[in-house]
């Protein structure tokens, strides 16, 4: 007895079940043959003794930690917060815990998590960050799933149909009579599926003869203060350009709405607005924001499925899972 708690050992279990320690070990690690009768005796002994297996020792034996690292720039962004929440729930159902890495404020954090993968501290990595050179990922032949980024032919990618998302956003603004549109686009410094929505949006606007001002956001910047700076910077540049439509990710779109109001104009009377991602924040602001919605729960399910399959030995080549997007109407595009 230690501190009033019965600290039973594997030897105690073996003695109570009338078997050798090696037999108990095979049951714990699910390795080698053990008859059903003997297995039942061991499980009953464990129950009676309230024996809890040493998870660390068992993982060392199996060379598995039961942990998946999930890397995002920051959970301060609602999209990443919802994604992590859903990935954690999916992996928990598969017997895994997550190790969360917010990488935007930590130099070399992404590389350090990959080193942990190499050293078996984590079993796999799901990454949605854009800070590390692709060549670093190509060196690693371990379970990795990429979210919205191309990292190499052996690393599966999970994304949405961004081209369709760009088309839907363009159609909404055009149907609402917008003639001069501000388009916030992600950085072109990394190769990512999300570029497809910007290309399609810009293509349609050009095809329709609509003026469109593209503002490229800085690489690897995912915080509200930067978005506030970027929006004010753009509005100052376009002070004399009477734009009437805005397209950007949720936080950018909402900050644009705030800036429109600060400049004594109204949404949607003077400026229409469409957001991309469709997280909960687009529904709790006033007016509610018309959004192109990414199916975050389904994206998380696919990422979790792929990483579990990779951990269990499956391999992929040039695998890309693409999910559809949808439109959720808000009051920012009402006529």
Provide a role label for each language-model segment.
Residues 89-134:
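Central regulatory/effector-binding core of bacterial HTH transcription factors
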Residues 73-82, 100-108, 158-168, 184-233, ...:
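Hinge/beta->alpha junction and helix N-cap segments in small-molecule ligand-binding domains
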């Amino acid at each position: 007895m230690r501190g009033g708690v019965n600290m039973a050992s594997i030897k105690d279990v073996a003695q109570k079940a009338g078997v050798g320690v090696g037999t108990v070990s095979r049951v714990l690690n699910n390795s080698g043959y053990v008859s059903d009768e003997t297995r039942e005796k061991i499980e009953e002994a464990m129950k009676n003794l309230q024996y809890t297996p040493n998870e660390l020792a068992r993982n060392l034996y199996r060379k598995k930690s039961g942990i998946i690292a999930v890397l995002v720039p920051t959970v301060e962004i609602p999209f990443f917060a919802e994604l992590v929440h859903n990935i954690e729930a999916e992996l928990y159902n598969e017997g895994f815990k997550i190790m969360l890495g917010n990488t935007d404020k930590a130099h070399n954090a992404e590389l350090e998590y990959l080193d942990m993968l190499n050293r078996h501290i984590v079993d796999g990595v799901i990454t949605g960050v854009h800070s590390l050179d692709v060549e670093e990922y190509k060196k690693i032949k371990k379970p990795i799933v990429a979210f919205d980024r191309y990292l190499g032919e052996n690393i599966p990618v999970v994304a949405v149909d961004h081209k369709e998302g760009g088309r839907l956003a363009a159609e909404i603004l055009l149907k609402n009579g917008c003639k001069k549109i501000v388009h916030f686009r992600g950085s072109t410094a990394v190769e990512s599926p999300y570029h497809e929505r910007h290309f399609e949006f810009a293509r349609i606007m050009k095809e329709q003869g609509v003026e469109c001002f593209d503002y490229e956001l800085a690489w690897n910047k995912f915080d509200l203060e930067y978005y506030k700076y970027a929006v004010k910077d753009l509005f100052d540049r376009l002070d004399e350009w009477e734009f009437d439509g805005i397209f950007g990710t949720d936080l950018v779109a909402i900050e644009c709405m705030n800036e429109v109001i600060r400049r004594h104009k109204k949404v949607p009377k003077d400026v229409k607005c469409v957001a991309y991602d469709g997280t909960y924040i687009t529904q709790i602001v006033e007016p509610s924001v018309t959004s192109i919605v990414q199916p975050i729960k389904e994206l998380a399910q696919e990422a979790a499925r792929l990483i579990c399959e990779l951990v269990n030995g499956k391999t992929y080549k040039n695998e890309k899972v693409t999910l559809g997007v949808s439109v959720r109407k808000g009051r920012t595009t009402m006529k």
